[in-house]
Amino acid sequence: MILRSEHIREPDGDSGAAMNQGDETDRRQHTRNMRVMRVARLAAPDIHAEGLGMVRDVSPGGMMIDAHFDLELGQTVSIALLDDQELTGTVVWKDGSMIGVSFAEEVPVDQILAKPSAQPDGKRARLPRFAVQRPVQLKLETAVVDAILHDVSQRGAKLQCEGKLRVHNNVLLRAEGQRAVAATIKWRAGDMLGVEFHRLLPVSELDQWLKL
């Protein structure tokens, strides 16, 4: 389980052996925690909801996460740092938007924090995608076409569009009240297409796309 900093105490020279032993256990647990700043997709299966989270602290036993949607104590939550990599845990403490999630079994921290690599089928592991259903526009050099945004990540998006767009076309993804994002069409299947952004979306900007 993730320990919050206020739970870590300095050893008291007048304390008994049992207390010293408990403090030593706390310190060992604390040293196993790794501070990070990673975007995650959080999902609550019991209410069929998902949202954005920022993982701040990871240990083999759990995570500390800044959750951008409401989760309750005791609730089961699924955490995806990559689109095809999910961990499941239980919310064991809550302080404002910060939550502590405990895993039933320890996880290999180095593996779950490793940089995305090629999968066995040759495809690149992707950052977590977030499902949305939002009207947007795609601007080309000579035209603007309407589209529906189906999912979005920090690196790209999937859209539905009937316009005559081709793979490798450069477009500008726009929505009312949102900063436009330059992108390149990477694939198309029927009226569905995928775009790759020319820049990595900051967390605050990704959050705004999810709230449109």
Tell what function each PLM region has.
Residues 1-212:
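Structured alpha-helical
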